[in-house]
Amino acid sequence: MEIELFSRSAGRIDLDPGEIVPVVVAPDNHSLSAILLHDAYYDLVRQHNDVIDGLAIANATSLIPLKAYAWLDQTRRLSQGEQIDSRKIKKHRSDVFRLALTLPATPGPRLPEEIRVDVTRFLESFPVTSPEWGEISRSLAATVGASVDPTEITAAIAAYFRLSPTG
């Protein structure tokens, strides 16, 4: 089980925005991470969550942009030579498209410009001709039993988040 706590910088911790600090809570693969978010992302999580048993749980409306940002950030850091687990990058990518299958057909909230840019950049990284779609499709088939059309799923994300069409 993994628990992630989201916060804004309190000014007392010297971390880069978006930096993740894992904290192992048990020897049996449980972990706890505290993630410092940019204000726009923090506000998104606060506004778009589901309360279950008194706990606010981020929903697809906030998780998709967060996962897209994590993919962009970790891909950038990997390209700059940083040691990044490629499985985590692939998981963020697949999570975006898996969560997109749960979005309603009606448009969602208007995102702040910073987040709109990030989600658009993420979608532009997966044109329908991308060789990654084979792996994405296999991942979705294994986890949710669904096959996806790249054009349809990227268009659904763009429509829900009110983004310009991507190709």
PLM ranges: what are they?
Residues 1-167:
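Compositionally biased terminal segments of proteins
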